[in-house]
Regions:
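Positively charged, low-complexity, intrinsically disordered RNA-binding extensions
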Residues: 2-3, 7, 96-165
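Short amphipathic alpha-helix segments
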Residues: 19-34, 68-69, 106-118
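Short edge beta-strands and adjacent turn/loop segments
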Residues: 36-47
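Short, conserved charged micro-motifs
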Residues: 17-18, 59-64, 105-109, 142-143
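N-terminal, positively charged regions that mediate nucleic acid binding
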Residues: 1-37
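Helix-adjacent hinge/juxtasegments
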Residues: 60-98
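Short, hydrophobic beta-strand segments
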Residues: 5-11, 48-55, 92-101
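Short glycine/threonine-rich beta-strand-turn micro-motifs
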Residues: 45-58, 129-139
């Protein structure tokens, strides 16, 4: 009797590539004519998975976010992996913007994905684990159909499919 096939649905970010994009962004800020004397800074806290942008004005912070976004895209990081807060007033008339790197699938999103897969009426079993989902079925074709379906959906964060067996 054939064993069930399965795969995991995860949301992970390669922090080394994020760090590389961050380094490229700081280099561009220090060299770009319109940004180098503005006093704008960007910091990355790897432990908290947090970007902190300090800028003299809101439009400068948006320019830095655009630079960082272009560097992240070139490094293969989906922009949905970074959740930006609204700009906040900081000391000295500056603006601070925080960007959180989103990893793992939270329970609400996992339940929504589970419901969407169940609504497809495929013979698959979905198990919600801590920060990922395991989808299993006797039919590999059903698993491929689920992968194609999930790629077409938008859950506000990037999804990867790993551990395909």
């Amino acid at each position: 009797m054939a064993k069930d096939s399965s795969f995991d649905v995860v949301s992970e970010v390669n922090m080394q590539e994020v760090d590389n994009a961050f380094q490229q962004t700081t280099r561009e800020i220090s060299q770009r004519y319109d940004l180098k004397d503005s006093g704008a800074t960007i910091e990355l806290s790897k432990g908290d998975k947090l970007f902190t942008i300090n800028a003299p004005a809101d439009f400068v912070s948006k320019q830095i976010i655009d630079v960082l976004s272009s560097k992240l895209i070139k490094r293969g990081i989906d922009l949905k992996a970074v959740s930006w807060d609204a700009p906040q007033a900081a000391s000295g008339g500056t603006v601070r913007v925080l960007g959180h790197i989103v990893e793992g699938i939270d329970q609400a999103t996992a339940k929504k994905i589970n419901k969407d897969i169940k609504d497809q009426k495929l013979k698959v079993k979905v198990t919600i684990e801590v920060d990922k989902l395991r989808v299993s079925s006797a039919s590999k074709d059903a698993l491929q159909t689920v992968i194609q379906f999930l790629r077409g959906q938008d859950y506000g964060q990037p999804l990867q499919f790993t551990n395909y067996r």
